[in-house]
């Protein structure tokens, strides 16, 4: 059992205690970040004259050889080490001797693990950003191709007003755009280096924390050594942002599941993103969308877990904080997988434009426009609302739609109606006369698509 402590103990650690306490099974995930931090630390120590240049070079060479061997599969990270820090240090000492024992000068595992976690989260935020951006590109492409794909918009899962598929996809574009902004915000707030904070009270060595921070492209050093090692609010922020991404993916998945059903038939999911049944040969199931929806709770659970872990911990570091890693690693991997699969699914999905438009023609999605027609002819809106309500009731009784009513039937309910009512309530007219920015009309949506392209090219 390789440990970085033990001098003041008279007994060996109980095997059960060792296994319970060890984190090597999961913190090996930031092996590369641990080495990155150690290389920066050693470089700074030599700059400050705490290590010689020769010692620095020997240690750096040793660290590079460890990375090369691990990456090549020649060196295995095993459970005989308590954590990734002890794995790196023990192997370094084996390779370079006494120089390796100086690696930890002016450093505690508390600031070391805080640094590793920040480096890891920072790297993963950049990967998540790429995935969200690609999803935005996919959405904008669908928008551009479907400016005239008419469909019903819904409230309460009931047909409400006619829109376009471009407009519907645009709603999700805005959601994921904000998700991307949240990731950027987190990156900016967390991008300060904790290295040099020690266990909680800094160190007596003349460290150059600004230099260490610059070597790893941080904005600068953190300004309170206790806060540096004692908080994981950036992890909580990340898990909150990931939960919001998953909430958006889950809502989108729910709609795709509904749209893919035989009752709606708005879309057909590609075979590559569908599965079948072991007993029912006719089935083609939207399992990817269902799994994305299901995995949302998994990410929510990670957020609630770290919030609960951190809520009662006195300053500074406590071992409870070791519990931040597995759930964060899992949440990040889950969201990355969901984003990639979801992007592939919607980019290959077939939209049934004729079914969508036909659906918009039924269900009285043009009722609001019939009321607006009356208002434009001098009828107060509240009266117009009541008149159109009676029209809908009449149509329901007759089993017809508003555009199937004769002019005589219209006039029986209100003499204001004339022949131009039919153009006013045509689904395409209903959509296209909505031209303000943010509305579903094709001219308005063209502008949005171009704004989206500009945003994606600049960000």
Predicted segments — roles?
Residues 2-37, 98-99, 280-459:
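Glycine-rich cofactor/substrate-binding loops
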Residues 41, 62, 66-69, 91, ...:
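Generic, well-ordered alpha-helical scaffold segments in large soluble proteins
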Residues 145, 182-185, 189, 218-222, ...:
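Conserved helix-loop functional segments at active or binding sites
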Residues 51, 75, 264-265, 380, ...:
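Conserved hydrophobic residue
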Residues 104, 109-112, 156-163, 167, ...:
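Alpha-helix capping and helix-loop boundary segments enriched in small/acidic/polar residues
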Residues 216-308:
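Acidic, glycine-rich loop-and-beta core segments that form the ion-binding/anion-interacting portion
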């Amino acid at each position: 059992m390789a440990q970085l402590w033990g001098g003041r103990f008279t007994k060996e650690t109980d095997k059960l205690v060792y296994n319970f306490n060890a984190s090597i099974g999961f913190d090996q995930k930031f092996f590369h970040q641990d080495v990155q931090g150690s290389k920066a630390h050693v470089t700074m120590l030599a700059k400050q004259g705490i290590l010689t240049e020769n010692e620095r070079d020997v240690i750096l060479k040793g660290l590079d050889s460890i990375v090369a061997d691990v990456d090549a599969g020649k060196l295995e990270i095993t459970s005989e080490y308590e954590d990734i820090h002890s794995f790196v240090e023990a192997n370094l000492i084996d390779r370079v001797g006494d120089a390796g024992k100086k690696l930890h000068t002016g450093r505690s595992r508390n600031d070391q693990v805080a640094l590793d976690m920040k480096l890891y989260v920072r790297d993963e935020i950049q990967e998540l950003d790429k995935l969200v951006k690609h999803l935005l590109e996919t959405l904008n492409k669908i928008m551009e191709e479907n400016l005239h794909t008419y469909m019903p918009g819904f409230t309460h899962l009931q047909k409400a007003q006619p829109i376009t598929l471009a407009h519907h996809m645009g709603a999700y574009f805005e959601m994921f755009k904000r998700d991307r902004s949240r990731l950027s915000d987190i990156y900016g707030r967390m991008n300060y280096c904790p290295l040099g904070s020690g266990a909680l009270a800094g160190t007596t060595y003349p460290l150059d924390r600004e230099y260490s921070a610059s070597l790893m492209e941080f904005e600068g050093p953190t300004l309170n050594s206790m806060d540096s090692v004692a908080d994981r609010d950036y992890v909580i922020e990340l898990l909150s942002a990931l939960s919001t991404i998953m909430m958006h993916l889950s809502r989108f998945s729910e709609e795709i599941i509904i749209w893919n059903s035989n009752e709606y038939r708005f879309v057909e999911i590609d075979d590559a993103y569908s599965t079948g049944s072991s007993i029912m040969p006719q089935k083609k199931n939207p399992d990817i969308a269902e799994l994305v929806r299901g995995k949302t709770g998994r990410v929510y659970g990670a957020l609630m877990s770290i919030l609960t872990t951190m809520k009662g911990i006195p300053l500074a570091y406590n071992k409870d904080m070791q519990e931040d890693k597995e759930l964060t690693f899992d949440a990040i991997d889950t969201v990355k997988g969901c984003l990639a699969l979801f992007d592939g699914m919607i980019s290959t999905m077939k939209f049934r434009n004729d079914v969508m438009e036909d659906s918009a023609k039924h269900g009285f999605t043009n009722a609001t426009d019939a009321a607006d027609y009356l208002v434009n002819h001098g009828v107060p809106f509240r009266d117009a609302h009541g008149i159109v309500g009676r029209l809908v009731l009449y149509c329901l009784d007759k089993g017809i739609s508003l555009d199937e009513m004769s002019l005589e039937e219209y006039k029986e309910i209100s003499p204001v109606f004339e022949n131009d009512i039919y153009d006013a309530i045509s689904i395409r007219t209903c959509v296209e006369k909505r031209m303000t920015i943010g509305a579903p009309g094709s001219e308005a949506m063209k502008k949005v698509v171009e704004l989206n392209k500009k945003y994606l090219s600049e960000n």
